[in-house]
Amino acid sequence: MAIAEEPAQAPVIQRIALVIQYLGQGFCGWQRQPRQRSVQGELESAIAAVVGHPVSVQSAGRTDTGVHAAAQVAHFETTSPIPAHRWPSVLNGRLTPDLNIRAAAIVPANWHARFSASYRRYRYTIYTDPCPNLFLNSYVWHYYQAPLCENQMQAALQTLVGYHHLAAFQRSGSKRQHAWVHVQDAWVRRRDSLIEIEVQASGFLYGMIRLLVGLLVQVGEGSRSLESFTDIWVNQRRDRVRHAAPPQGLCLLRIGYPDSPFPVDAWFDTQPLFVLPSSRNDSESLSPCAVSLG
C-alpha cells in the first residue's frame, strides 16, 4: 500500500522593514526611473540578488534628486529565512558607499512604511559664511549674499504649525488629491554660520520643503515681509513662490511610528556630523600643543 506524501508546506512570507541612509547627489531620487540610478532601484537589485526573486521596496516618502536621507524607512516581502538582524550586513556588502542599511526588523503583514507612519521630519541646512567650506558644500545651501535674520524666519515658519491648506508650496506634477498638511512642529535656529530649518508633519507635498525654504530666505534677508509670506500661503498664491532652495541642503531626518519596530539605538548616529551639537570652547581646546605624547 502506497504511503501518501504529505503536501509541501508553502514558504513563509516575511515583511522586512529597513532604516536606510543615502547621499542624494548620486541618485535621481528615491523612485525607480528607467535608465537612471535611483535608491529604490539599487535596493531592489541588491535584495533580489540575495533572495533569488524580484522584490518591490516601498518607502515612507519619496525624496527628490539630490536630497539626502539620514533615516528613510522602507519595507519589502520575501520568503528568505535570513533573520532580521543580518539584513544590514548582508545588503551593505552589496551596496555602494553612498547607500547604507542602518537597521532591519520583521513587521506584521499589515504594517506599511508609508501608511503606518505618524510623521516625517526634514531638516534644511543653510551655510552663511562667505568663505566656502569643502566639507559642507554637498550638504548645505551656501547662501551668503545677504545677512539672514533667523528670528524673522522663525516667526514666518510658526504660522504654518497646525492643519492648513498649503497649495502654495506644492510643485506642479503632484498626484496628491489635496494639499492639506498637518504641520506638527517647526523651528529655525542658528549655530554659528549654520542656519537649520526643521519641519515635522504627517506628510509633505511634492517639493514643499524646498519651496518653503526659498520663501523663508526672502523673509530672512528682508526682501519679503511676514505679512506677505502669510498672505501667499493663506490665499494660495503659488505664482509668487518662484524659487526653490537647492536640493543638497535637504535631509530626511526620521520617520515616526506609533509603535516603532526598530530598537531605540537604530536612530543613533544617523545624522551628519556637522549638524550634531558641539561646543566652540571644546573644539578650540583641542590644539596639537595640548596633546601629550609621552
From Swiss-Prot:
It comes from Synechococcus sp. (strain ATCC 27144 / PCC 6301 / SAUG 1402/1). InterPro entries: PsdUridine_synth_cat_dom_sf, PsdUridine_synth_TruA, PsdUridine_synth_TruA_a/b_dom, PsdUridine_synth_TruA_C, TruA/RsuA/RluB/E/F_N. Substrate binds at Y122. Keywords: Isomerase, tRNA processing. One of its GO terms (biological process) is tRNA pseudouridine synthesis. The gene is truA. GO terms for molecular function: RNA binding; tRNA pseudouridine(38-40) synthase activity. Pfam families: PseudoU_synth_1 (PF01416). Homodimer. It is an enzyme of class 5 (isomerase). This is tRNA pseudouridine synthase A. The active site is at D64.
